[in-house]
From Swiss-Prot:
GO terms for cellular component: nuclear chromosome; nucleoplasm. This is DNA repair-scaffolding protein. It comes from the Eukaryota. Found in a complex, at least composed of BLM, RAD51 and SPIDR; the complex formation is mediated by SPIDR. Interacts (via C-terminal region) with BLM; the interaction is direct. Interacts with RAD51; the interaction is direct. Interacts (via the C-terminal region) with FIGNL1 (via N-terminal one-half region); the interaction is direct. Keywords: Disease variant, DNA damage, DNA recombination, DNA repair, Nucleus. Induction: Up-regulated in vascular endothelial cells treated with IL4. (Microbial infection) Up-regulated upon SARS-CoV infection. One of its GO terms (biological process) is cellular response to ionizing radiation. It is linked to Ovarian dysgenesis 9: An autosomal recessive form of ovarian dysgenesis, a disorder characterized by lack of spontaneous pubertal development, primary amenorrhea, uterine hypoplasia, and hypergonadotropic hypogonadism as a result of streak gonads. Plays a role in DNA double-strand break (DBS) repair via homologous recombination (HR). Serves as a scaffolding protein that helps to promote the recruitment of DNA-processing enzymes like the helicase BLM and recombinase RAD51 to site of DNA damage, and hence contributes to maintain genomic integrity.
Amino acid sequence: MPRGSRARGSKRKRSWNTECPSFPGERPLQVRRAGLRTAGAAASLSEAWLRCGEGFQNTSGNPSLTAEEKTITEKHLELCPRPKQETTTSKSTSGLTDITWSSSGSDLSDEDKTLSQLQRDELQFIDWEIDSDRAEASDCDEFEDDEGAVEISDCASCASNQSLTSDEKLSELPKPSSIEILEYSSDSEKEDDLENVLLIDSESPHKYHVQFASDARQIMERLIDPRTKSTETILHTPQKPTAKFPRTPENSAKKKLLRGGLAERLNGLQNRERSAISLWRHQCISYQKTLSGRKSGVLTVKILELHEECAMQVAMCEQLLGSPATSSSQSVAPRPGAGLKVLFTKETAGYLRGRPQDTVRIFPPWQKLIIPSGSCPVILNTYFCEKVVAKEDSEKTCEVYCPDIPLPRRSISLAQMFVIKGLTNNSPEIQVVCSGVATTGTAWTHGHKEAKQRIPTSTPLRDSLLDVVESQGAASWPGAGVRVVVQRVYSLPSRDSTRGQQGASSGHTDPAGTRACLLVQDACGMFGEVHLEFTMSKARQLEGKSCSLVGMKVLQKVTRGRTAGIFSLIDTLWPPAIPLKTPGRDQPCEEIKTHLPPPALCYILTAHPNLGQIDIIDEDPIYKLYQPPVTRCLRDILQMNDLGTRCSFYATVIYQKPQLKSLLLLEQREIWLLVTDVTLQTKEERDPRLPKTLLVYVAPLCVLGSEVLEALAGAAPHSLFFKDALRDQGRIVCAERTVLLLQKPLLSVVSGASSCELPGPVMLDSLDSATPVNSICSVQGTVVGVDESTAFSWPVCDMCGNGRLEQRPEDRGAFSCGDCSRVVTSPVLKRHLQVFLDCRSRPQCRVKVKLLQRSISSLLRFAAGEDGSYEVKSVLGKEVGLLNCFVQSVTAHPTSCIGLEEIELLSAGGASAEH
């Protein structure tokens, strides 16, 4: 096989993929078939080059070629004329063009490398479309049929075809003006990083380099010397165009940064910065040793005020002479007591956790920026900082510091940034209002001019919340407000809080890790949820009132698909009670009241720490939009078919699981409440198909107030008001935005729903096939078996009921109680017993009941033997009275079995049941 040729696959079968060697003395292919050129072939070749080179830039000074110098390639590319020494070549030899197809791994001659290096300096990029391969294949077909003047050969190097040396040719060549065409139709994934360029010298016709690295070969087109000809010509089919597109950083699985680019340099800078900071914190002890020296370069400042500005923490500081711990130390700073403005990044501020009156050491390399018109210098590059804490104040600092207190944020207008006097002087002043946020910082008196921010009393109030959001954007609204009515007030857990923090609260304070929320509605019907820093007792006073919202900030825009919970609450307030206003009109429209669909979006708002303000508007007609929750009885709620809707009711809690005896046991857990009311207990009012009790599931996301938590920890039954609970299949769910209250609010009440007092003892449903899990029922049956594997007994203290008694040898085997610190002479014996019952209501079912101590004592009263032990046969066949049981499990496969646990209902004077 000739040099430079490669084996072709079996799939690449074409009639013109053959070898055509030329013998010595034979005329070139171009001369023999010169008369076969047609206008159609020239036109097709011209169209192909025009498609591929639409982006070529026209160069000035390209005169038309003579008839003797027009080859196929030169005719359609309009190259520059030849040098003068070649104008005397014959017509046959001047039209000869040799395109060399070579592999990308073959070695080029020295002159090729030199010329390519010269041409790389003036490359111009032109995008090459993907159909360039198809145009190339079609051109090759026309070459075979009509364009016989082109000779195609495959060789490794054609340096021997030139009689001149490389230095002579380089001296004769003018400055090349090359064009680089990117070829993106890559056939090899391993060569994606190679350059696919087409180098065309528009000045010199000696050499034309065509490199296709994506095709794993290099194409060199040059004008051969008429005295030397190639001894063999090999025709090869170019690679077929494939559907594989180049991998870009957007669709590449492994994204790589461009070497030497800006992204790589920034990435390296960030890595070096993090490494330097980590290394400095690791070697912080060695820096402490240099504090006493005069050339340490450590800047010691005292923080006077902190605020956030443009995602940076700005600290107004006072420069100190030295460290407060060492009065003899001297700082490098020559001006003790001078005012400084220190900038901390978000990461540095999070690590430093500085507060007013804290002392901070700033280690080099810090920089000082002095602004000519500024009030004080600015300290930059504060990556290496350390807070100084005295030993006697270390414990107090840890107790006083509260990371949850947000820093005040200052929004600076563009007029203040660019000192536009026409806007800054005439713009209304904005007042800083801190609603429920503790002020952190002291007055800055070192020449710092704080901008007076005051909300004008004549702030225009709009009727549409949507108009304010669209005009003001997601930022705070310093100069605009909206009139709303507060429809609901509830608590939501904070995003970074857990339910376990609720157990730490006591008294009448709000649970920790929660925030008060207001569901507001404007005059046009748009709803919004406002997150506040108020206490719930203060926020509840706003329900049903018309208020003005000023200085709000949009946190999120939610839809029904994302947040279904808030829209289930909005649906209970729709349609509106009065006609709504149309944006842009002063008077409400009667048609809007009934023809508007329910809202599909809602804005989550928050009060700006400095600008947020909520004021009650007296005698505003928008308060008529308020719709209090409609209270229903449990009988009506069970007869409703609308699942997923909100409902409000009064009910008496007769049992809860788990039994919470202390507030310390309240954690982020689910609670099951069994409730009932008069409509389910009275025979005259209740439907026999309805249950006598109803299950209420309290989800972990439901925030419970301190009063409700104390009531759940007690043993007495309590009546609760369930506000905006979710209706589910056979139960009620208390989820987010559900409120549980002990006191009865002044709300509209349906007849029969306000009576919370039960007429007598609580009646339960009997066990049957329809009894669900997590419900309570009454059971009566005959003992048919005992679970001996789980039966055991243990002694407890007769004074305090402690079950962890110790038996000491020095007390002659007597038990001692650690809680009472005394010897227990007569301990009480407790037993654990589970029996199987034969119930008439479930004849084919295996009923297993875990008995209470009272039922066990009654069952074993006359079954004890002479030695104090009990025989199983002594309890078989005994009747068990009416037991109140909690359904723990119901299984139907492989056998029908029900697991019950005997419980004791909450009574006014009783204690919790012992299990």
